[in-house]
């Protein structure tokens, strides 16, 4: 008899067999599920605190996705030989899992919940992100926590005009789309994607296809819960304090309405702070007069937020102007300036309303590419995009330092949007880094980074295939009434039911990200939203094209220039030299950066054209092949009794035998040659070991016959 109550569910999912199991591993967690997809195995665990901390006014959910190197049969690098802080990839997948789970916890549930997913085994062809998301959903479902799931997820590719479910990594190389969709049985909750300029119809079709195909995973989780689920928690939301709600509404509603008539963000924020403070103070006075305890500020703040949301949502659904006075379809005023920083390779200042990004592009060589030591294998990243948003961007003080999860996520979204329109490495051999510094923020800063990033790249001379613009959209839904908002503000993001970001060109979409906070948003609503987003994107693209028609044809004076030459791959070791001595001397003496690929392509980069020319000349000399019948100007290196060693090319010596020096018999070689003497010689033979035989006599004879190219200054008796 076993000590485990192990429950296993298996199902065929597209081209993969999936196995879910619970009851054997991590039994002390609130919920734990193993997911196995063709040897990619993840362990997802959930622990929920039984009570909320006193005064807690938000839901403390943390999701950590962790890759273990043993999963791929590797030992970690570094001094300690163990895993360190999460990589960028792990952070992005943690966010990917968090986003569809968070809205499914009930309002008012403030108990701490921690979701931890470990990758235990990795099939390099099967990415672990979808199994991890399925596992996290299943672990929450079996835990009994108050969770309105389960959630399913799927990856969708678009290959040869057909959707493909959960493609392998090799298949993804052929795909024009990489789309991840997560949702419940009834609704889509999250979309994350990048595409090769696809139409809105194809993108929406991928979302619908993924939602349909994930249902089998949701059904399997239901089966797992029926047999292995723990009892549901007896949790009930706190009863609404109707007297408090009525009193706060009485005290604050008129002032909140007045605050939302202020179009300027700073003035509006200041007014809202005044209303919050005045309301709390008045409630404290009421409590003191009545001999009771006043409601805590968190509770009062939640009531005020609900009133704010109702005001803004009602105004918009009734067709009244938005917070800043716009209608639902208008994009905020746009200002564009390029070349703003004198010593950078490319720069742009993109301002849209109260959101502003200063974006800088830097060009580098192959040696500047980022080495990624991923679980599935090492690779190099030629294009990097980093997003930073310091606290001053919103007029606040706060922590400054390493990027937070949000900054990493926004940077990746902007990178995905631009990647489809970058030239290939063959077309433009530079590595590229784009940094977006958000200097003002009031909504849609990641999309400002896309617009500014495209402009900075063009300013740097990167031949982009097309202009790329991005726009953030919002949606408010009440019953049968809904409104789609173009170019949302920060406040509209918080108060709406869906926010989604669309980036692309005139031809199509390159990136799409959706986060849906409620159930009930239909395909038809998403269709309307995408069509309105396209309208906004086209408006921004027209502004960008007017400001910058195309990429600069001349690089910055401070950007490196590059030339490439092809050498025999067998000569690579000669250019590198023993311990790197030759290439090190080359780079130091010519002031260049030299990269050599395995196929013999040598890339020379420098801000000095003279240095590049010198480096090229030296490399060509080093790699010249000795050809039989060719005449060389050589230098005598060493005299021997039977001949001389003559250097004819850098690193290439040959034997000039005593019988090949002159037509007459030579008794003493010193009568004809001396160390360091310049001598013209002809290559008469090479062998498989690379040994070279030379002749000066052959040139004397050619000269005697009147042949062209007769040697000059041939060796003569001393």
From Swiss-Prot:
Pfam family, one: KH_1
EC number assigned by the record: 2.7.7.8
Domain KH: 560-619
Enzyme class label: transferase
Domain called S1 motif: residue spans: 629-697
SUPFAM superfamilies (alphabetical): Eukaryotic type KH-domain (KH-domain type I), Nucleic acid-binding proteins, Ribonuclease PH domain 2-like, Ribosomal protein S5 domain 2-like
Binding site for Mg(2+): 493, 499
GO cellular component: cytosol
Family annotation (InterPro entries): ExoRNase_PH_dom1, ExoRNase_PH_dom2, ExoRNase_PH_dom2_sf, KH_dom, KH_dom_type_1, KH_dom_type_1_sf, NA-bd_OB-fold, PNPase
Role description: Involved in mRNA degradation. Catalyzes the phosphorolysis of single-stranded polyribonucleotides processively in the 3'- to 5'-direction.
Protein name as it appears in the record: Polyribonucleotide nucleotidyltransferase
Recorded name of the encoding gene: pnp
């Amino acid at each position: 008899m076993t000590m485990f109550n192990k429950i296993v569910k298996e199902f065929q999912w597209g081209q993969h067999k999936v196995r879910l199991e619970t009851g054997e591993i991590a039994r002390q967690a609130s919920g734990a599920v193993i997911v196995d997809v063709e040897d990619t195995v993840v362990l997802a665990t959930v622990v929920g605190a039984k009570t909320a901390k006193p005064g807690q006014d938000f839901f403390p959910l943390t999701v950590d996705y962790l890759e273990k190197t043993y999963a791929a049969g590797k030992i970690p690098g570094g001094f300690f030989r163990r895993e360190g802080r999460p990589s960028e990839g792990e952070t992005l997948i943690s966010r990917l899992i968090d986003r569809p789970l968070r809205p499914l916890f009930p309002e008012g549930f403030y108990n701490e919940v921690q979701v931890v997913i470990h990758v235990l085994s990795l099939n390099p062809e099967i990415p672990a992100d979808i199994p991890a998301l399925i596992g996290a959903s299943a672990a929450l479902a079996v835990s009994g926590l108050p969770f309105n799931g389960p959630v399913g997820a799927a990856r969708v590719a678009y290959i040869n005009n057909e959707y493909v479910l959960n493609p392998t990594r090799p298949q993804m190389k052929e795909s024009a789309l990489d789309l991840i969709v997560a949702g419940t049985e009834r609704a889509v909750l999250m979309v994350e994607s990048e595409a090769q300029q696809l139409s809105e119809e194809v993108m929406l079709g991928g979302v619908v296809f993924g939602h349909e195909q994930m249902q089998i995973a949701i059904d399997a989780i239901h089966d797992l819960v029926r047999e292995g689920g723990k009892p549901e928690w007896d949790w009930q939301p706190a009863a609404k304090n109707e007297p408090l709600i009525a009193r706060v509404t009485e005290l604050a509603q008129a002032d909140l309405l007045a605050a939302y008539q202020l179009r300027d963000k700073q003035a509006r924020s200041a007014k809202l702070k005044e209303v919050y403070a005045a309301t709390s103070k008045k409630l404290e006075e009421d409590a003191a007069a009545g001999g009771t305890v006043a409601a805590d500020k968190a509770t009062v703040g939640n009531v005020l937020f609900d009133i704010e949301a109702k005001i803004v949502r009602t105004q918009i659904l009734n067709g009244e102007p938005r917070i800043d006075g716009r209608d639902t379809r208008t994009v905020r005023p746009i200002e564009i300036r390029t070349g703003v920083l004198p010593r950078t390779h490319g720069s742009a200042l993109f301002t849209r309303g109260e959101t502003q990004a200063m974006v800088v592009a830097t060009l580098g060589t192959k040696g500047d590419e980022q080495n990624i030591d991923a679980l599935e294998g090492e690779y190099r990243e030629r294009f990097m995009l980093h997003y930073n948003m310091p606290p001053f961007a919103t007029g606040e003080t706060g922590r400054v330092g390493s990027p937070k999860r949000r900054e990493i996520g926004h940077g990746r979204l902007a990178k995905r949007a631009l990647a489809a329109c970058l030239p290939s490495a063959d077309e433009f051999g530079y590595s590229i880094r784009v940094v977006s510094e958000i200097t003002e923020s009031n909504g849609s800063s990641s999309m400002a980074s896309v617009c500014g990033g495209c402009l900075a790249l063009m300013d740097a001379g990167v031949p982009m295939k097309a202009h790329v613009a991005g726009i953030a959209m919002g949606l408010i839904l009440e019953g049968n009434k809904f409104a789609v908002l173009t170019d949302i503000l920060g406040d509209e993001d918080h108060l709406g039911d869906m926010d989604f970001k669309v980036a692309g060109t005139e031809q199509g979409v390159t990136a799409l990200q959706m986060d849906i906070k409620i159930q009930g948003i239909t395909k038809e609503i998403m269709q309307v939203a995408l069509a309105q987003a396209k309208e906004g994107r086209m408006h921004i693209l027209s502004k960008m094209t007017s400001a910058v028609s195309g990429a600069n044809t001349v690089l910055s004076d401070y950007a490196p220039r590059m030339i490439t030459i092809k050498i025999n791959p067998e000569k690579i070791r000669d250019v590198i030299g023993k311990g790197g001595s030759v290439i090190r001397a080359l780079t130091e003496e010519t002031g260049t950066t030299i990269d050599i690929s395995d196929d013999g392509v040598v890339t020379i980069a420098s801000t000095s054209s003279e240095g590049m020319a010198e480096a090229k000349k030296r490399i060509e000399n080093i790699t010249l092949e000795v050809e039989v019948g060719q005449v060389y100007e050589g230098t005598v290196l060493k005299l021997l009794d039977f001949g001389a060693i003559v250097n004819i090319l850098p690193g290439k010596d040959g034997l000039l035998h005593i019988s090949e020096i002159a037509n007459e018999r030579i008794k003493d070689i010193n009568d004809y040659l001396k160390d360091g003497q310049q001598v013209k010689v002809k290559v008469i033979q090479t062998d498989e070991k690379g040994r070279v035989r030379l002749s000066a006599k052959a040139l004397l004879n050619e000269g005697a016959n009147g042949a062209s190219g007769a040697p000059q200054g041939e060796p003569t008796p001393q």
